[in-house]
Curated annotation (Swiss-Prot):
Glycans are attached at N77, N192, N281, N324. The chain crosses the membrane at residues 6-26. Keywords: Disulfide bond, Endoplasmic reticulum, Glycoprotein, Hydrolase, Lipid metabolism, Membrane, Microsome, Signal-anchor, Transmembrane, Transmembrane helix. This is Arylacetamide deacetylase. Disulfide bonds join C115-C339. Residues 1-5 are cytoplasmic. The active site is at S188, D342, H372. It is found in: Endoplasmic reticulum membrane; Microsome membrane. Belongs to the 'GDXG' lipolytic enzyme family. Residues 27-398 are lumenal.
């Protein structure tokens, strides 16, 4: 009898631990629940270790994610190599089939909340191989310094210097890339860095080669308003909750947990920077269907001292949605994927609107049954569907 009760209690506790609310139209929910449970377990262990003072939360999660790392092994379709671009590690994928013309080039930036991730992760290695083979393109997948060891602007600067190196005529010639067909792409935090470096590279007089396209996959684009409708509506959905998103943002700037606490309350933007809120005012930038009866409330003013200590969240290099229209107007053809069940959905939607308002050619794919991270999760139907949409657009436009 005692064993039966113990077993019953154990089953209930396990079920409670793994349960997450999922919308009815999410495909293959048990695969998502399993993946989310593994991430949740790793996160809880990391939190426990941090509570005991054993290790920083993100350092522990990085250790757990090491199982994702795969070697730069060439296959029957693609030659894979590793090198440095201006002291930044990159992994390069070159199709093996003969080409009589110069190939297009894609510079890819991985996600991971500026704290996790690597070009060597299985999910990014797989995507880069598929991209190189499918598009007959040279793919450069870049790494960059990660928090908590490094904070903004290190991540931006690493990616910027790496891309700038790639855009030299002699480097493109070395890898057989057509200088008229170079694009940049990234997912999540990589989408953030994609938008940021694309804006800044336009203003660099020493960079003569222009990017043809940029592709942003569920990008994080602003850290001023942490209570947009998608953050309220999707706050507990996998694989990125609102609390984890805010932890990533705050770690990007500092290990000082005071910033995280202020961001959780949406009370971190001081009055002195309130003029920037016009660029992220979802009440004027979101289509009506995504507002769903939410009422806009200006974020409660925060501490000027906090903003002065950690100015990154008011810097356009960290938050590309803060760029002036005069900058956005000159951006290249843009592709943006947003997902309905993603806390970052509204960042992407607002950027679509702002780019369209300034005359940029934008293709926007909204995945009605999509969620954060779906582009690179192995073995899911939605992953293949999203990758095909993404690669089809690149094939047509790059």
């Amino acid at each position: 009898m005692g064993r039966t009760i113990f077993l019953l209690i154990s089953v209930v506790l396990v079920a409670y631990y793994i349960y997450i609310p999922l919308p009815d139209d999410i495909e293959e929910p048990w695969k998502i629940i399993l993946g989310n449970t593994l991430l949740k377990l790793g996160g809880d262990l990391a939190s426990f270790g941090e509570l005991l003072g054993l290790n920083h939360f993100m350092d522990t999660v990085q250790l757990f994610m090491r199982f994702q790392v795969v070697p730069p092994t060439s296959d029957e379709n693609v030659t894979v190599m590793e090198t440095d671009f201006n002291s930044v590690p990159v992994r390069i994928y070159i199709p093996k089939r003969k080409s009589t013309t110069l190939r297009r080039g894609l510079f890819f930036i991985h996600g991971g909340g500026w704290c996790l991730g690597s070009a060597a992760y299985f999910m990014y290695d797989t995507l880069s191989r598929r991209t190189a083979h499918r598009l007959d393109a040279v793919v450069v997948s870049t790494d960059y310094g990660l928090a908590p060891k490094y904070h903004f602007p290190k991540q931006f600067e690493d990616v910027y210097h790496s891309l700038r190196w790639f855009l030299q005529e002699d480097i493109l010639e070395k890898y057989g890339v057509d200088p008229r067909r170079v694009g940049v792409s990234g997912d999540s935090a990589g989408g953030n860095l994609t938008a940021a470096v694309t804006q800044q590279i336009l203003q660099d007089p020493d960079v003569k080669i222009k990017l043809k396209v940029q592709a942003l996959i569920y990008p994080a684009l602003q850290a001023l308003d942490m209570n947009v409708p998608s953050q309220q509506e999707n706050s507990q959905y996998p694989l990125l909750t609102r609390s984890l998103l805010i932890r990533f943002w705050s770690e990007y700037f500092t290990t000082d947990r005071d910033l995280e606490k202020a961001m959780l309350l949406n009370q971190h933007v001081p009055v002195e920077f309130s003029h920037l809120l016009q660029f992220v005012n979802w009440s004027s930038l979101l289509p009506q269907r995504y507002k769903k009866g939410y009422f806009y409330k200006t974020p409660t003013p925060g501490s000027l001292e906090l903003a002065q200590k950690y100015p990154g969240f008011t810097d356009v290099k960290a938050c590309p949605l803060l760029a002036n229209d005069s900058i956005l107007h000159h951006l290249p053809m843009t592709y943006i994927i947003t997902c309905q069940y993603d806390v970052l959905r509204d960042d992407g939607l607002m950027y679509v609107k702002r780019l369209q308002n300034t005359g940029v050619h934008v293709t926007h794919h909204h995945i009605e049954d999509g969620f954060h991270g779906a582009l690179t999760l192995p073995g899911l139907k939605i992953t293949y569907r999203m990758q095909n949409q993404y690669l089809n657009w690149l094939h047509k436009n790059l």
